[in-house]
């Protein structure tokens, strides 16, 4: 299930903007309480790059991990043109805080691993090690989620 909400908000630079919340929920969310949420905080232009800053949270049962995440123009362009490689597709971003591993078992649901780099989160050193959050979703829901994120570009 994908949810997109718009809210009016002020960011730390005292600019008023419409906040956009994009949520991807596990197909069994009522039981697993597993989801990832991106809330657009602001957009900044630095050195000819447009950077989209998000407050991001991942939930699993009664646990929640919150962090700031940045997507660059090129990340957004890549999301708009994503192509699936069977059976495994990887989506990486310039900021290595997280990436997606998509596994298509040719069944009703995709298996999405959202991989968090704990080395980067704790020591500002990319390590490609950390926790992964597994979300099972219909391919149409994941495509809608990616399109909602990319539409912010």
Regions found by a protein language model. Give the residues of each.
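Intrinsic disorder/low-complexity signal
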Residues: 6, 10-11, 25, 103, ...
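Beta-strand elements of well-folded, non-transmembrane domains
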Residues: 42-44, 58-62, 71-75, 116-120, ...
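Short, well-structured hydrophobic secondary-structure segments
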Residues: 49-88
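Amphipathic protein-protein interaction modules
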Residues: 87-129
């Amino acid at each position: 299930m994908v949810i997109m909400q718009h809210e009016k908000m002020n960011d730390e630079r005292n600019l008023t903007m419409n906040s956009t919340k994009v949520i991807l929920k596990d197909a069994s969310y009522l039981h697993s309480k597993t989801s990832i949420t991106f809330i657009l905080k602001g957009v900044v232009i630095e050195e000819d790059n447009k950077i989209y800053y998000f407050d991001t949270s991942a939930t699993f049962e009664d646990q929640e991990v919150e962090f700031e995440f940045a997507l660059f123009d090129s990340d957004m362009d890549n999301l708009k043109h994503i192509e699936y490689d069977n059976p495994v597709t990887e989506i990486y971003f310039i900021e290595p805080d997280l990436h997606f591993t998509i596994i298509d078992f040719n069944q009703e649901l995709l298996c999405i691993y959202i991989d968090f780099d704990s080395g980067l989160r704790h020591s500002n050193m990319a390590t490609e090690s950390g926790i992964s959050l597994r979300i099972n979703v219909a391919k149409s829901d994941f495509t809608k989620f990616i399109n909602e994120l990319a539409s912010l570009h």
